[in-house]
Amino acid sequence: QAMFPEGGLSRDGYLRPPKIGLLDSMLCSKEDRSFTRDLLFVPVGINYDRVLEDRVLVGESDDKPKTTKAGMFKRTLSIIFGNAMKFWNRQIRKNGHATVHFGDPISFDEWHGQRGVDIFTLDKKNRRQHVAEFCEKVMNEVGLLIPVTPVCLVCDVLVREPVITIDALTSAVEKGIEEFRGLGAIVVAEEKGAEWMVEGALLRLGLRHVIKQNEQTVRVNPDDARIVAYYANSVAHYRKGGIPTVEKPNYV
């Protein structure tokens, strides 16, 4: 079965630390000694040139009153319906890449056998200390599979240089391709070259009025700076050296 170790969608684009309770509840099936099958976790990395509900997610900031689940559901439906109508009327162009990568299965039994202790004989607090380490192992594998799409790559530059010439942007994206590859990332459509990636990303961002562009210069719309940051943040963990560390005391 599929699960989101983070416990939900990211509101700022960052890869979030895992929720220990979710995995702990699954792993506790091993407390039943008659259950002898291995538990295999297949890490999956997904990223997009466009997340349909990005404006809804970005709007859910900590310094604003929280939207109720019903309110968020209605807003999300409204955005999805609006996009569907645009597709129907052929008013919106291709949304770009939606890319998924699957990693090698992670065997819980193999990991557990290397612990030197049966974690299911421990009390809840100590067991969850071990489960937290397994969570981090899984999420680190997920993080290494998150693709770097053209829009994310361009936004990674624009978040630092909100006003930039197209030539400078293309040069920065070219360097970004090499940097992310060196960090072990999968760069989507890198074979097309930086110029092609920039052209496509700016087209999609421009259609949404996230950026303003003339023949020489690109400028981020200040009202949508957080949208640019959202896509840049989705690949920021490569530079930070991995996912945020689980704060174990919060989960015991």
Where are the language model's segments positioned?
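Membrane-interfacial terminal anchoring regions of lipid-handling membrane enzymes
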Residues: 1-252
